[in-house]
Amino acid sequence: MKSTTKDLVFIALSTTIMIVCAFITVPFYVPFTMQTFALFTIIGLLGTKKAFISICLYLLLGAVGLPVFSGFKGGIGSLLGVTGGYLIGFLFTVIVSGTLLHIFSKRKKCTVVSYCVAMVLGLIVCYAFGTLWFLLLYTNSTGSISVTSVLSLCVFPFILPDMVKIGLSWYVVKLLKKHIMRL
């Protein structure tokens, strides 16, 4: 397969995987989904540029109204709502984690530890952006809320599940990367 055709296929498949993982949901104020697992796996398999395009496509599909977000939601309101910052934060996760993975792989130091460090740092950026977004929008629409309350609602419950997803994504990337490179 030609490189550009192969890239387009992988980007489309990754976007589809992101959509499917958004539908695997445990309802909560900020829903528990498998999106972050898909995000970490996409970054690990595709690298920064292609992963960024895939996540942009995912967000664009949702923004135009297709029900690709958790709870079968879509529309610009999903992105601009109080929890939309976490979705937009996925783009920052791609940039941070993908760049770090690239640096580690150039130095031949892309181990499970460096993979996890790259993903955790990207996730922290996503948490920070999403939390700040939530705090600003919630405060403007409803009234004052403390940072601790937002963290308790939107971040703390997700830390352990996200760490498990990072470990699981490393395993999946390790299994699939060698096969994808052969295509």
Cite the ranges covered by each PLM segment.
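Short helix-perturbing small/polar motifs within transmembrane alpha-helices
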Residues: L13, V20, I76-A128
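Hydrophobic transmembrane alpha-helices
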Residues: M1-S54, V64
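Helix-boundary and loop/linker segments of multi-pass membrane transporters
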Residues: M1-T4, Y29-V30, G71-F72, I76, ...
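Membrane-embedded alpha-helical hairpins and interfacial helices in multi-pass inner-membrane proteins
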Residues: K109-L183
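Interfacial aromatic-anchored transmembrane helix boundaries in multi-pass membrane proteins
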Residues: A22-F32, L59-T93
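Hydrophobic residues within alpha-helical transmembrane segments
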Residues: L13, C56-L60, G84, F92, ...
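Hydrophobic alpha-helical transmembrane segments
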Residues: L8-L13, F37, T41, F52-L57, ...
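Alpha-helical membrane-inserting segments
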Residues: I17, C21, T25, I42, ...
